[in-house]
Regions:
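Helical segment within the ABC ATPase nucleotide-binding domain
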Residues: 173-186
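A short, proline-enriched helix->beta-strand linker immediately N-terminal to the Walker B motif
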Residues: 152-156
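A short, flexible loop at the N-terminus of ABC-type nucleotide-binding domains that lies
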Residues: 1-6, 10-23, 30, 73
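Conserved ABC ATPase "signature" region
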Residues: 100, 104, 111-129
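ABC ATPase "signature
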Residues: 218-219
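Catalytic Walker B motif of ABC-type/P-loop ATPase nucleotide-binding domains
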Residues: 158-162
């Protein structure tokens, strides 16, 4: 059974000229890092929002771990972690207080929660800043706390929307390296959106390049690159397939 199965998924927002998603279908194997890649407005975030139950599809179907998103969302939410692009933290609370709050939401308490928080703060180099208010954090520090909040409950599937956008090179590398090791150590499936194709090329086992709500191509990054003549990167592949840069809006 695949981790995610999507069939003919469509989404058209009210008053929109074009659909945000135009009949996309794919299957994502378990224990893989899968990237949805493309420019802003391509349909990446809409896809993840439907999988999380934040947005309802216009038509089509989606399953996570064999459960129908439209019918079994309550059960699905117990086994997924969501890390949104917009920082979902309380700025007046400290990093530790934020993590305690999110841990409590998942039913974690006492020493179990304390040990998890201590472990991840150390992993992400945040121990010395744990008792500072989030409003005092840099963008990279906020991203790291945001990620920790999404994995405290040991999800079977982790969904990340642009997890490294707007951060410094050091934080970007730290997050990418962690996702690789976390995937290997736990066999967790990771879904990830990005318009940073160089990063995705190194991180993802498989990618789907999306443009104007459609999947342009899908497969292992190096396989896709090798199949295209005079192509040496995902960025070059995107330009060849769409006629524009991923940075174009």
């Amino acid at each position: 059974m695949p981790a995610v199965s999507i069939h003919s998924l469509c989404k058209t927002y009210k008053d929109a000229v074009e659909p945000s998603l135009n009949s996309i279908s794919l299957e994502i194997p378990r224990a893989t890092i899968f990237g949805f890649l493309g420019p802003n407005g391509a349909g990446k975030t809409t896809t993840l929002s439907i999988l999380c139950g934040l947005v309802k599809a216009t038509s089509g179907s989606a399953k996570i771990l064999g459960k129908d998103v439209s019918k079994e969302l309550k059960e699905i939410k117990k086994c997924i972690g969501m890390v949104p692009q917009d920082i979902a933290l309380f700025p007046t609370l400290t990093g530790q207080e934020n993590l305690t709050y999110f841990g409590n939401l998942y039913g974690l308490k006492g020493k179990v929660l304390e040990n998890k928080i201590e472990h991840y703060l150390d992993t992400f180099g945040l121990t010395n800043n744990a008792h500072k208010r989030v409003s005092q954090y840099s963008g990279g520090m906020k991203r790291r706390i945001n990620l920790i909040a999404g994995i405290l409950h040991d999800p079977q599937l982790l969904i990340l929307d642009e997890p490294t956008v707007g951060v410094d090179v050091q934080s970007r590398k730290m997050i990418s390296d962690f996702l690789k090791s976390y995937n290997k150590a736990n066999g967790i499936t990771i879904l990830y959106t990005s318009h940073m194709l160089d990063e995705a090329e190194k991180l993802c086992d498989e990618v789907a390049i999306i443009d104007h709500g459609k999947i342009v191509t899908q497969g292992a990054p190096q396989t896709l690159i090798a199949q295209q003549e005079n192509c040496h990167s995902l960025e070059a592949l995107f330009i060849q397939l769409t006629g524009r840069s991923v940075r174009d809006h």
